[in-house]
Amino acid sequence: MVEELNRFPLLRRGGAYNVNKKSPQASMQAIKYTVDALGDRNNIIYNFPQGIIKPPNFRPIEFQTGLTYIAEKAAKRYGKVYLMPVAVNYMFLRDNRPEVLVEFGDLIELNDDKPDRKKYTEFLAKTLEALCDKQFYDISQGHFKGYDTLFQRKLKWYRRIEQRLKKIEVKGSGV
């Protein structure tokens, strides 16, 4: 994750931090920081549980156990914790700039019951993989009804003309 933070400085500006898996002390410090941050209801933690940023369609999705460990610690301290899988995809659909498509999965509640860490990690990975596959299928079929446009830049002049021409009804010649 350190390499990703260096390659994408926007992540660091957004509050991203890395977990140094080579140093057990640094890993535990990052986990403690995350659990403490979850104590504030205004905080949301976005996690890349694969341990590295991978392309959206990379399969199989495999998680490291850190997410489950963090969720266990937070649930033990605060009574429960909520997890939500988020599928993010970027594609060149209608213009020469990519569109970012984000889909939120169902909320998963983890109580202070201690689940089997390995099985729960696999469950979370399969849940995210199913959401990503559904999103990819919807995109490939042109189903965009569930998506809202959050930001749209002004169309180029030729795209505006193209949209106007599509609105004009042309009657057939009857031939």
Language model feature labels by segment:
Residues 24-175:
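Non-catalytic C-terminal accessory region of glycerolipid acyltransferases
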Residues 1-25:
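Catalytic core of membrane glycerolipid acyltransferases/transacylases, capturing the structured
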